[in-house]
């Protein structure tokens, strides 16, 4: 286009106004229709989302995009669209790419952003699953270690318990034998004491019988040798008087002294006679 009317194509550059919109191409004023098209192209679609790292909030420096060589005819026609410079999306500003022969710069779309988010979620899920598996493995390892320690402790304490049990059984058997021996000794002594007691009782019975027999024989012999004799009391009258005097004079017993002297004289006389 324009090659038939212009024998030579020249390179052009663009300039921007305060709103960063292309207005001038090497001193050539753009038409209003071209400006409107650029406005329409620079508006982002409703379903389009900002891609992380490509918006204006990104702190990365914006690379300088060289302007491609565009052939411009010497006599521009108002109805013919003139090639425009790259839109703000090429410079890193938010917005979509314009449909036109401007540049071939590829910007990540919403689908690519969703893919990045999905991959990030998958990575997080994979990391979480790996951590969970690691925790489960650690728990299994700890449980196995505790089980091994318990089994080891049980195995170590089992011989001691067995030896202690054997010792207790031996001691119980020894004590049982000693108890049986003690019971047998007590039974033997009980039998011996009963025999001795029986013998002593028999001997005592024989002695009692013999002593009783001897006593009766001696009593019979004494009765046969000793003759009985009647004895009358001596001075019985004086005895009665003395007792009556003492009874009547409890606090004056000296009053009975004459009776006592008479009783003594009577007894002496009876002994002499």
UniProtKB/Swiss-Prot annotation:
One of its GO terms (cellular component) is MICOS complex. This is MICOS complex subunit Mic25. Residues 75-84 have a biased composition (Pro residues). A motif (Cx9C motif 1) lies at residues 235-245. Transmembrane segments: none annotated. GO terms for biological process: cristae formation; DNA damage response. A lipid is attached at residue 2 (N-myristoyl glycine). Pfam families: CHCH, MIC19_MIC25. It is a lipid-anchor. Signal peptide: none annotated. Residues 130-189 form a coiled coil. Keywords: Coiled coil, Disulfide bond, Lipoprotein, Membrane, Mitochondrion, Mitochondrion inner membrane, Myristate, Phosphoprotein. Component of the mitochondrial contact site and cristae organizing system (MICOS) complex, composed of at least MICOS10/MIC10, CHCHD3/MIC19, CHCHD6/MIC25, APOOL/MIC27, IMMT/MIC60, APOO/MIC23/MIC26 and MICOS13/MIC13. This complex was also known under the names MINOS or MitOS complex. The MICOS complex associates with mitochondrial outer membrane proteins SAMM50, MTX1 and MTX2 (together described as components of the mitochondrial outer membrane sorting assembly machinery (SAM) complex) and DNAJC11, mitochondrial inner membrane protein TMEM11 and with HSPA9. It comes from the Eukaryota. The modification Phosphoserine is found at residues 13, 31, 33. Belongs to the MICOS complex subunit Mic19 family. Metazoan Mic25 subfamily. Its main location: mitochondrion. A motif (Cx9C motif 2) lies at residues 256-266. Component of the MICOS complex, a large protein complex of the mitochondrial inner membrane that plays crucial roles in the maintenance of crista junctions, inner membrane architecture, and formation of contact sites to the outer membrane. Residues 40-59, 73-118, 150-181 are annotated as: Disordered. Residues 232-273 form the CHCH domain. The lineage of its organism: Eukaryota, Metazoa, Chordata, Craniata, Vertebrata. InterPro entries: CHCH, MIC19/MIC25, MIC25. Disulfide bonds join 235-266, 245-256.
């Amino acid at each position: 286009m324009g090659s038939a009317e212009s024998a030579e194509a020249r390179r052009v550059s663009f300039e921007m106004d305060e709103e960063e919109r292309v207005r001038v191409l090497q001193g050539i004023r753009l038409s209003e229709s071209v400006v409107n098209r650029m406005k329409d192209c620079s508006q982002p679609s409703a379903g389009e989302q900002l891609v992380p790292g490509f918006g204006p909030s990104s702190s990365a420096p914006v690379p300088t995009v060289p302007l491609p060589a565009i052939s411009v005819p010497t006599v521009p026609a108002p109805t013919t669209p003139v090639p425009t410079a790259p839109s703000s999306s090429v410079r890193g500003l938010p917005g979509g790419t314009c449909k036109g022969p401007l540049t071939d710069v590829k910007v990540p779309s919403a689908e690519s952003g969703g893919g990045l988010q999905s991959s990030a979620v998958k990575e997080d899920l994979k990391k979480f699953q790996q951590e969970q598996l690691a925790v489960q493995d650690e728990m299994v390892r700890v449980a196995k270690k505790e089980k091994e320690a318990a089994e080891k402790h049980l195995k170590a304490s089992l011989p001691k318990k067995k030896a202690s049990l054997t010792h207790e059984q031996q001691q119980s058997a020894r004590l049982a034998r000693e108890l049986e021996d003690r019971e047998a000794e007590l039974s033997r002594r009980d039998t011996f004491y009963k025999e001795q007691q029986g013998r002593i009782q028999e001997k005592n019975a024989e002695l009692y019988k013999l002593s009783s027999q001897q006593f009766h024989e001696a009593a019979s012999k004494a009765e046969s040798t000793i003759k009985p004799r009647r004895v009358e009391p001596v001075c019985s009258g004086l005895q009665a008087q003395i007792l009556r005097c003492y009874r009547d004079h409890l606090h004056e017993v000296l009053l009975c002294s004459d009776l006592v002297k008479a009783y003594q004289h009577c007894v002496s006389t009876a002994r002499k006679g």
